[in-house]
Amino acid sequence: MSERVPAIKVLLLPKDTNALGTIFGGVILSHIDLASAVEARKVAPRRYVTKAMREVEFHEPVFLGDVVNFFTETVRVGRTSITVRVSVESERWGSGQGERVKVTEAEVVLVAVGDDGRPVPIKEGKG
């Protein structure tokens, strides 16, 4: 059985923290957006914009120094949109063990757009 490969992997830094000293949720959302775009481009090499983030759930905090993995899975491909599920796992290196913990999950809807920014069919032509 092959091990899952993250769409993106990020080491979070002091600039990413909130007033509590954990990683700001908006930073995680930004990386979820990027990871979903990477997945969508693997499915069909187009230009995409984010239409919606659904069912975002923060399970655990992300700590300074965590290595954060963003795993993606295509859920649905429509005429002009792709829905991607993103599962976020932190590798906890503060204790020196590298324990992996599920911290966040979300579903992202991306729409393929042409040069004019209007929706275009995913399966036709280039973006």
Question: What is the predicted role of each segment?
Answer:
Residues 1-52, 111-127:
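Hot-dog-fold acyl-thioester-processing enzymes
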Residues 3-8, 63-64, 75-127:
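HotDog/MaoC-like acyl-thioester-processing domains
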